[in-house]
Amino acid sequence: MEELKGYLEKSQSKQQHFLYPLLFLEYIYALAHDHGLNVNGSIFYEPAEMSGYDNKFSSLLVKRLITRMYQQNFLINSVNDSNQNRFVGHNKNFYSQMISEGFAVIVEIPFSLRLVSSLEEKKEIPKSQNLRSIHSIFPFFEDKLSHLNYVSDILIPYPVHLKILVQILQCWIQDVPSLHLLRFFFHEYHNWNNIITPKKSSYGFSKENPRLFRFLYNSYVVECESILVFLRKQSSYLRSTSSGTFLERTHFYEKIEQQHLVVLCYNDFQKILWLFKDPFMHYVRYQGKSILASKGTHFLMKKWKSYFVNFWQCHFHFWSQPRRIHINQFSKFSFYFLGYLSNVPINPSAVKSQMLENSFLIDTVTKKFETIVPIVPMIGSLSKAKFCNVLGNPISKPVWADLLDSDIIDRFGRICRNLSHYYSGSSKKQSLYRIKYILRLSCARTLARKHKSTVRAFMQRLGSEFLEEFFTEEEKVISLALPRISYPLHKLYRERIWYXDIIRINDLVNHL
């Protein structure tokens, strides 16, 4: 990274980052290979039919690639006559795929260096786990959402036009050859609708190069959110700043006017920003789903909805369905986010008060942010994974019946502990207990199937040692103290706990 930083500093002195020459450096592909090992494997291996060995990283392939890249029209020829690469076997576009993986590493370099430099300026580099923890969102929800009135459940629209993606990156990367290469990849992966595929709670990416398309998608989402951040910042000091300054800071408002749909114009800019002024507005996003919450009125939320739809249509040139944005009251609505079913119910209560000889009742209303394990979708997810049927009845997992007993118990126990760890912040544990029961009994049925025995006989033979494999470390400590606990400790056991070491959504939860 130090070598890359020195190279880019030289390029920056000429007012440009020249990223394209980095494609001719061998260690770039080594970085892509190392990243591939940590994710889903990599293509930088010598094929077995060529090397005579099992899959191993081959610098020879990289050297061949770099040599051929110096040839004129190499990329064009590799697409038009992809069968000429006979030594790569069934993968016709092997070389272009190698280049795309290397290119994915290169385009991230300026953003990584910019992040490091900004943290160094603050003289404080926070722990990466704290920056990446997705569960840090929920303490924020607990503090803020109970005081708000309305919530918008937003699905960010897809797919975006390929030219728009290139235009987005032009703001960050001025290296023209790199942008041309990006257009080449778009031409190769022509079926863009299959590159980013929608799911209920997450987006899937192209199997050919998920890192590149994840980077492109994140760039697109940042562009979508930039207008929201801009309006939020400007509305906070609207009265002290002239409207002319706003138009000098951004260009996309002019594009909107050219589309003959005047959402923001020079004369009414201050007035329109004033309409969106809301000091109690909060926005949170994970992958393709975002939450916009406000203390304002329903009319204000409808204006935000209309503005988002118009912005997507004019700036990204595609139709966005208004039904992708739902507006609801917190007291009457539950929303799915990061595998939790969350809501803010109103809990009425009566307090008896007495003054001298007179006593009377005072009606009070409290609101508390609730996080619940969605049991019906979770049972559906467990059913797809063959741990139970669609009704939630545990079944055996035959594909694991050939493993050792210790491996079977370890696999089931690890899944159960991970789910307990992920859903530790649930305010109601009954659904979590049912999920753990399904996994424990599915494990027992799998072992009984392997040994051709009954579940009852197998459970009696293993005893409590079998159940301990499904406890988390925290539950083991508390279970030892349960016979002698006081009430506060028992209450602590039922409280929500958010862990800052959870950096991605659980695989079973991801199906929700």
UniProtKB/Swiss-Prot annotation:
Localization per Swiss-Prot or TrEMBL: Plastid, Chloroplast
Entry keywords, A to Z: Chloroplast, mRNA processing, Plastid, RNA-binding, tRNA processing
GO MF annotation, one: RNA binding
InterPro entries given in the database record: Domain_X (IPR024937), Maturase_MatK (IPR002866), Maturase_MatK_N (IPR024942)
Gene Ontology BP annotations: mRNA processing; RNA splicing; tRNA processing
Source organism, top-level taxon: Eukaryota
Keyword set includes Cytoplasm: no
Main location: plastid
Gene Ontology annotations for the cellular component aspect, listed alphabetically: chloroplast
Family listed: Belongs to the intron maturase 2 family. MatK subfamily.
Described function: Usually encoded in the trnK tRNA gene intron. Probably assists in splicing its own and other chloroplast group II introns.
Name of protein: Maturase K
Source organism: Zantedeschia aethiopica
